[in-house]
From Swiss-Prot:
It comes from Pseudomonas syringae pv. tomato (strain ATCC BAA-871 / DC3000). GO terms for cellular component: plasma membrane. This is Xylose import ATP-binding protein XylG. It is found in: Cell inner membrane. Residues 6-245, 262-507 form the ABC transporter domain.
Amino acid sequence: MSDYLLQMNGIVKTFDGVKALNGIDIKVRPGECVGLCGENGAGKSTLMKVLSAVYPYGTWEGEILWDGNPLKAQSISETEAAGIVIIHQELTLVPDLSVAENIFMGHELTLRGGRMNYPAMIHRAETLMRELKVPDMNVALPVSQYGGGHQQLVEIAKALNKQARLLILDEPSSALTRSEIEVLLGIIHDLKAKGVACVYISHKLDEVAAVCDTISVIRDGKHIATTAMAEMDIPKIITQMVGREMSNLYPTDAHDIGEVIFEARNITCYDVDNPKRKRVDDISFVLKRGEILGIAGLVGAGRTELVSALFGAYPGRYSGEVWLDGQPVDTRTPLKSIRAGLCMVPEDRKRQGIIPDMGVGQNITLAVLDNYSKMTRIDAEAELGSIDREISRMHLKTASPFLPITSLSGGNQQKAVLAKMLLTRPRVLILDEPTRGVDVGAKYEIYKLMGALAAEGVAIIMVSSELAEVLGVSDRVLVIGEGRLCGDFINHELTQEQVLAAALSHPGDPDSNDPANNNHNDNDRKTT
């Protein structure tokens, strides 16, 4: 019998004559966690779709050996029956069903006559959650009553209930808090000890380093290297991923900061479900021409609610004023905001940033169709010219602008959303989690773009949950806590500890602000 549970040998997958995978080899032993690393568009998701039979046997070349025997699965149900289970970045739970019902979906236990055996399902679900160290979870409650971290564990329980021997985790921590991530990594270590193998796909390389035994890197559809994690470090992984050394993830190009161009006055947002509760409480701040303002805070602090209100996209009731060039402007809808010179790249690009049924190019020009309108028709040649320029400027990887945008990787979808907003020629650009789910190479390109836009005089507001990112690219940092402004810092030798201390402080406390706060006379961007 082979030492390997899984062997993928010489995998080739072609789309319209283009090789998305070109001879990739991957091997996984029982109880081993293999980190699958690569930039967006490198082929990671395509490879996992081959393995899980989303692309069935016969639609690709090469061979898959499972326990030393050829695997020629034609459907996901066949691979799951073999013990290969994938947990996607977007959870597949049904919110209104109970935890137990979600765990047994498609594999329900029944009594004679076909009735559901709910007591048996609840007992088994409770056993699974205890194994995952969540003994107090009420598996009879709707899964929607639990947060993202617990829902991720329900997905793992669902996989274990299918007798998973190989667990594929695709960006499993993208919506989790730091503490939830620690729980997840601990559970993966426990599963490894029980002989369950894992393939871990994540752009968060610190997680990859913490949980993986082996690193396999692919680039442009080709296998670059497979190395024991003990012989690797994060800079080496990055070098293999991007094909070049990156001495500094955050660009250090200086840019001048001008006069105040934007002002938010007394922004207050009320909870959608509880209109008496304030999600954002009377926040005011200014923004200068060419300035990059980072907004930091803990999960639930109100950062997304704040910027959504500024752009006119907050779904609940809100109040306050937005001023541009010393004059109040109407930003009560996204269209009015765009016309005023304010645009936003939203946090949830799949639901709010793209139209899935449209092509890449159509998504890029969606916000500026008036620019190409001639009476009752669109000037297709002019539109395509703009699309090609944006694809080139954004280094967007696509075989054709006419392909569905859903055919792109997450990072390239994000570049398309950015291109769409930049075609509006904004004076103020809001970026909400702009690099979430984006690989390290694409992150660097986005940071470079932000610096170039700031150098052109565009004022930028960036919300990010990654403190290193906030400190790496921002000129100034606002800290939000429990819906209120807790700190306003010039980013000069500012530390993550100072930002966290402000986020955890009570707004208005003397200690919640650094002495440098509100000192906005520093017109040169810090260098890192």
